[in-house]
Every structure is written in C-alpha cells, then in structure tokens.
Amino acid sequence: YQFLLLKALKELNNPSYDITPEVITMYVSHILECLYNNEKISVADFASGSGNFLINLAALSKGDYELTSVDVDNNYARLQQNIFNLLETNVEIINQDALKPLNIKKQDVIISDVPFGYYADEDNSLNYKLCSAEGYSLNALLFIEQAANYLNDNGVGVLVVPKKVLELEDNFKKFLEEDINLNAVITLPDEMFKNASQQKAIILITKKDQTKLPNQVFLAQVPSHKNKEGYANFIEEFKNWLSEK
C-alpha cells in the first residue's frame, strides 16, 4: 500500500502533497484502543489527503471502524477511491472543503492531521468563532472548531496540530472556556521534526458535559517508539489518566 501511494503521489507531481507518517498513525491507533477497547465506532478524517491516516488506522487497529474521509482535493479523492477499492476497505469519501457544512452524522471520533497555514476562504471563516479578527484565519483553529461541531455528545476529537497553535490566542482561550474541553496535549517526539517551529502535538478535545474523558488535562511527551519501555510507560500513564474519570 505505501509503495502504491508514494508512486501515485510522485505521478501527481505536486510538492504540497504529503502523507501522515505511519508512526503518528500508530500513536493515534493506540490512543483509540485505550479509549474504545475495540468497540464499533464511527471515525471521520476531515483532512484526509491521500487517505493514509485512515487506512493505516484501520490496518493497525483491532476495532471495527465505520470510516468517513473528507478532502477538498479532486486528485486526492480519486487516489483514495482507487486505493480503498484495491484494499477492499469500505470508506465514504466526500470530496469537498471540510470547513463548509458537511452532510454526515455526528461522529464518535474525528481525526485529522490538520493542514499548516491559513484558510483562503475569508467569507466562510466568518462562520467560525475561531476566525481571525483581521486577515486570513489559521487552518488549525478552524479544523478544531469544525471537529467539535461534528462530534456526538461523548465523541472525541483526536487532532494532530502544530504545537505553536496551542500558545493560545485570546479567542482560542475563550473557546476552550465556553465551548469545548481540551482534555489532552501529547507532544510528539522532538526527533520527528527538523526544528522546533515544525513540532506537532496530538490533542484530544470533547464537548462540554461529556463523560468519556477526565476533565483534568493529560500532558505528556511521547517517547520515541524505539524506546519500548518508555513508550509502554506512556501508554500505562494514559490508561491511568482515563481511569480517573
């Protein structure tokens, strides 16, 4: 699968096309296993790109996932269709801007490796509480808000975001106080990034009044997956945190 995907991306010849590293998918898969213990759940990716995140998640997990993939890029949508058909994986593929209204049911889990940079549609960004007061709005903040919009009452957003986004602009602080819970911030290993400005974190978000996760924020840095003992300890700490709710 990875070979076919990389070959297809090379043929599309667009330098902006990239895939979510498999190790990040592994981390998210383990988090979902801790949360849902292989229950049947609905999972949507709102920035699915090549579909790599979803397909690796389905392959790595023992759970039964009802998958929905959303991406604005036509080439990515066609690529996903071909690869998911080849792998005989049932996925609903929606080819549209994920920050526009979506005709999908509320989800148990929403994942996204959210895009860097700014959202080009200033008019649509005005529909979001996390839009910028002036100029273009950050993609990451809008994706966080949109994920919250489509979670069911006890759903969990598991989002890979630039860590610098968490330096909390005023409107994000207000959004956290009034609209959602930021339940966990899990910083990815430093070695995965060329410099500090590129560093990412996995965040867990839920709606107010949810009962799925503890409200006390879980803060951690994931050890390298090569450090098996350290990684096992991280998973144990995460499970202990879950038991506190």
Describe each PLM feature range.
Residues Y1-S61:
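Class I S-adenosyl-L-methionine
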Residues S197-K245:
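Flexible, glycine-/basic-rich loop-and-beta segments that form/coincide
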Residues E66-D71:
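Conserved SAM-binding motif I beta-strand of class I
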Residues Y136-E191:
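Conserved Class I SAM-dependent methyltransferase catalytic core
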Residues K100-I111:
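A short acidic, Gly/Pro-enriched loop at the edge of an enzyme's catalytic core
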Residues V114-F143:
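Mobile active-site "lid"/loop adjacent to the S-adenosyl-L-methionine
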Residues E88-A98:
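Conserved SAM-binding strand-loop segment of SAM-dependent methyltransferases
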Residues Q80-Q81:
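Conserved SAM-binding loop
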